[in-house]
């Protein structure tokens, strides 16, 4: 398995010490333009990207970058540059959660789908208790000329490796391994007992198409079956954590594509786009392994870093505004992180 501590420290060594802060051993904050900062990250070294870029459509002056682009196309071109870098730095089995507005969702997905498999589009409903509903309760309904945008979107995606929907790195590797040792998909299905009845598994054809991912037990059976045929030792098989995209949910989590997490209530010093810790934890727990590296390229006040630390992950936060860099440093230094793993 990849030595995550070594990878993490290697990544951080590439940044200027004047703009790098380490409020916790496993939490780093880098000040600057994340599009440029990402170029210093080695390829295929980040496990999960969880990030909240400017929405553009909301046009809020108190969010850096939200009013930067006059045309939608300029904003989309800018975001496409991020997508290219995200794919380069993500591990082959990495994932991305990218927040966006409902208005820009489809245009962004169109750009992202050039480099990523769009696995889900999550609707965050933002429910709140009476008295904390903001403009939803106060605004005059008769003035509406379209449905009130009470939700936000989160695009969940993984790097695409092929020309068809869902083509994945593992799927391509499995097919090449099978061809190398001359074992049919049907025979491998028989050996592993994966007939598609288990949602986490699916038949070999589904794994190769990228529609499903094998469980740890199924992957072990795959490797053992292939090793018997690989008499010349031609194949080096990665550990499960280095090739299978993590996706681990249970009944205690929000596991559908509708997420109901209350918004962060107003407090002195609150970031205008701050996301709730429990929502971020839901994504991190599902789509990363313990000790993985989580990157937020628009980190704001450091919520993603706090959520990552609480689940035993390492974090790298990139933020362009010095005000929020300092707020993040203070937050992570003073917050008592409760480990939830």
Describe the function of each predicted region.
Residues 324, 340-341:
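Charged C-terminal helix
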Residues 76, 333-339:
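Conserved phosphoryl-transfer catalytic core
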Residues 328-329:
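Conserved SAM-binding loop
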């Amino acid at each position: 398995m990849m030595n995550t501590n070594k990878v993490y420290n290697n990544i951080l060594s590439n940044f200027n010490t004047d703009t790098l802060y380490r409020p916790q051993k496993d939490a780093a904050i880098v000040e600057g333009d994340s599009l440029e900062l990402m170029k210093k990250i080695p390829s295929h070294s980040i496990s999960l990207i969880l990030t909240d870029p400017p929405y553009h459509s909301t046009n809020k002056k108190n969010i850096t970058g939200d009013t930067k682009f006059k045309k939608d196309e300029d904003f989309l071109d800018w975001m496409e540059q991020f997508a290219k870098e995200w794919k380069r730095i993500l591990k082959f089995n990495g994932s991305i959660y990218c927040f966006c507005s409902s208005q820009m969702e489809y245009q962004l997905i169109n750009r992202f789908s050039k480099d990523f498999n769009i696995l889900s589009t999550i609707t965050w409903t933002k429910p709140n208790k009476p008295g904390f509903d903001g403009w939803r309760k106060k605004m005059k309904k008769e003035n509406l000329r379209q449905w009130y945008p009470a939700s936000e979107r989160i695009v969940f995606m993984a790097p695409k490796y092929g020309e068809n929907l869902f083509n994945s790195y593992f799927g391509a590797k499995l097919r090449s391994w099978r061809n190398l040792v001359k074992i049919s998909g049907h025979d491998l299905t028989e050996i592993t007992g994966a007939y598609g009845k288990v949602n986490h598994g699916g038949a070999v054809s589904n794994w190769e198409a990228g529609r499903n991912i094998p469980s740890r037990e199924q992957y072990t059976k795959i490797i053992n079956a292939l090793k018997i045929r690989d008499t010349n030792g031609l194949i080096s098989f990665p550990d499960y954590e280095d090739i299978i995209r993590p996706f681990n949910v249970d009944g205690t989590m929000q596991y559908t594509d509708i997420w109901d997490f209350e918004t962060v209530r107003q407090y002195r010093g609150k970031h205008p786009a701050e996301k709730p810790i429990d929502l971020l934890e839901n994504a991190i727990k599902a789509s990363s392994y313990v000790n993985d590296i989580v990157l937020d390229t628009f980190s704001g006040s450091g919520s993603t870093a706090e959520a990552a630390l609480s689940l035993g992950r390492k974090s790298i936060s990139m933020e362009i505004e010095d005000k929020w860099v300092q707020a993040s440093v203070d937050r992570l230094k003073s917050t008592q992180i409760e480990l939830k793993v």
